[in-house]
Amino acid sequence: MAKIGRALISVSEKTGVVEFSRALAGYGVEILSTGGTAKLLREAGIAVKDVSEFTGFPEMLDGRVKTLHPKVHGGILGMRENPAHVAKMQEHGIEPIDMVVVNLYPFEATVAKEDCTMEDAIENIDIGGPTMLRSAAKNNRDVTVVVDHADYAVVLDEMKNSGGSVSRETNFRLAVKVYQHTAAYDGAISNWLGARTGEGVAPFPDTLTMQYKLAQGMRYGENPHQSGAFYVEKGSRESSISTARQIQGKELSYNNIGDTDAALECVKQFTEPACVIVKHANPCGVALGANIMEAYDKAYKTDPESAFGGIIAFNRELDESTARAIVERQFVEVIIAPKVTEAASEIVAAKKNVRLMECGFWPENPAPRFDYKRVNGGMLVQDADLELFTELKVVTKRAPTDKEMEDLLFTWRVAKFVKSNAIVYGRDNSTVGVGAGQMSRVNSARIAAIKAEHAGIPVQGAVMASDAFFPFRDGLDNAASVGVTAVIQPGGSMRDAEVIAAADEHGIAMVFTSMRHFRH
């Protein structure tokens, strides 16, 4: 085990550093420090030696050069069990540094500010910090390196139990954490600077660097013969499947996570109380109601057969009555809501395998983000599809009634989350039938009608949403044959005139959005 005799402490994020330093001093550890950290520790009554005194060389260039010195890096990198290293250290008066406690300038927080300039960004690129961290991590057999204040307690507990030493096993784990941290730090700098050109900000950097943290292992992946795991974005704060808290139930599976993400992101679109039921990443029942009990009841009745073993998402607090209705009515894999009442949690607890999730509430307007799709040997990157339409243009002789327009906008939101080719029939803010994932758009329309008939729900008087344009009039003819009265679609087909004429023939009102919502 490595006995700690001297520690260099220099941190931007100062949470817990005073208490940690005081505890180190209690073990007789000499503390070296710089700048604001040294000032803070002295004000707390802790003895500190400035790094400039330790090296015999002053800080210079407005603080850009503080720790870049052989006495610092020799003291960190010198191998204690290597006689040649020890001899050279003695020859040059280099004293060992046994612990490095450093975190880095807040580059990501700086560039996240709207008024951040290039100068601000450059000045928040840490040089000495990463260099010390990497040096200490390289020599982890002899040096303890701490980059995360969450590890202060771990280190102190080990020192308490070992008389002031830290094990090589702990040092190795902390060193790995350092390289993960510096990789993410350099990646953030690379991504931000790489998007800056002489002509402004490019939408995508030349090189994209990302880091995800292992959140959980899994019994298997999408299928039992595949291994799987779940990684989450570092520092993610948005209400999502990645930040949700599991209250009870079995461990989330690979498919559970994908389906719950689809359900939650769909239900987030609605401001009224809403319920979304998803099966295999497709909404099979979506509805709005005066409350979530009504919304759930309507959504379930759309397609009770497909709802079996599905994922249920709400945009309101899950209450006792709704929880009871779910567990008494159907088998469900996951229930997710922004908040769960204690009474609702107790009801669901009767079904111990049901995964109950609480994700927190979300802002009305989501922050822009990227979507990623892995392909063999590469990755597709795009803006997330957060917009709804470019315009609402009535293109037929008959305009939709106010009630039809309300249902059109409802089904349009649902269609965004149905796999293409997507057709959604809806009425009274509830899905009537969903046709998903067909290679032919007219077949998706036929399937939506079949689903409605199977559930005993008449399509007559319903509206229809299509995620992309109709290439031929057959989609409109099919809609008319089952009683659809209004249609919403992007438009943009070379046969738009033919499709509009078909709608007029059938007395169907049609609205173009000028925005497609393919989903693959």
From Swiss-Prot:
<comment type="pathway">
    <text>Purine metabolism; IMP biosynthesis via de novo pathway; 5-formamido-1-(5-phospho-D-ribosyl)imidazole-4-carboxamide from 5-amino-1-(5-phospho-D-ribosyl)imidazole-4-carboxamide (10-formyl THF route): step 1/1.</text>
</comment>
<protein>
    <recommendedName>
        <fullName>Bifunctional purine biosynthesis protein PurH</fullName>
        <ecNumber>2.1.2.3</ecNumber>
        <ecNumber>3.5.4.10</ecNumber>
    </recommendedName>
</protein>
<dbReference type="InterPro" id="IPR024051">
    <property type="entry name" value="AICAR_Tfase_dup_dom_sf"/>
</dbReference>
<keyword id="KW-0658">Purine biosynthesis</keyword>
<dbReference type="GO" id="GO:0005829">
    <property type="term" value="C:cytosol"/>
</dbReference>
<dbReference type="GO" id="GO:0003937">
    <property type="term" value="F:IMP cyclohydrolase activity"/>
</dbReference>
<comment type="pathway">
    <text>Purine metabolism; IMP biosynthesis via de novo pathway; IMP from 5-formamido-1-(5-phospho-D-ribosyl)imidazole-4-carboxamide: step 1/1.</text>
</comment>
<dbReference type="InterPro" id="IPR011607">
    <property type="entry name" value="MGS-like_dom"/>
</dbReference>
<dbReference type="InterPro" id="IPR036914">
    <property type="entry name" value="MGS-like_dom_sf"/>
</dbReference>
<dbReference type="GO" id="GO:0006189">
    <property type="term" value="P:'de novo' IMP biosynthetic process"/>
</dbReference>
<dbReference type="InterPro" id="IPR016193">
    <property type="entry name" value="Cytidine_deaminase-like"/>
</dbReference>
<keyword id="KW-0808">Transferase</keyword>
<feature type="domain" description="MGS-like">
    <location>
        <begin position="1"/>
        <end position="147"/>
    </location>
</feature>
<dbReference type="InterPro" id="IPR002695">
    <property type="entry name" value="PurH-like"/>
</dbReference>
<dbReference type="Pfam" id="PF01808">
    <property type="entry name" value="AICARFT_IMPCHas"/>
</dbReference>
<keyword id="KW-0378">Hydrolase</keyword>
<dbReference type="Pfam" id="PF02142">
    <property type="entry name" value="MGS"/>
</dbReference>
<dbReference type="GO" id="GO:0004643">
    <property type="term" value="F:phosphoribosylaminoimidazolecarboxamide formyltransferase activity"/>
</dbReference>
<keyword id="KW-0511">Multifunctional enzyme</keyword>
<comment type="similarity">
    <text>Belongs to the PurH family.</text>
</comment>
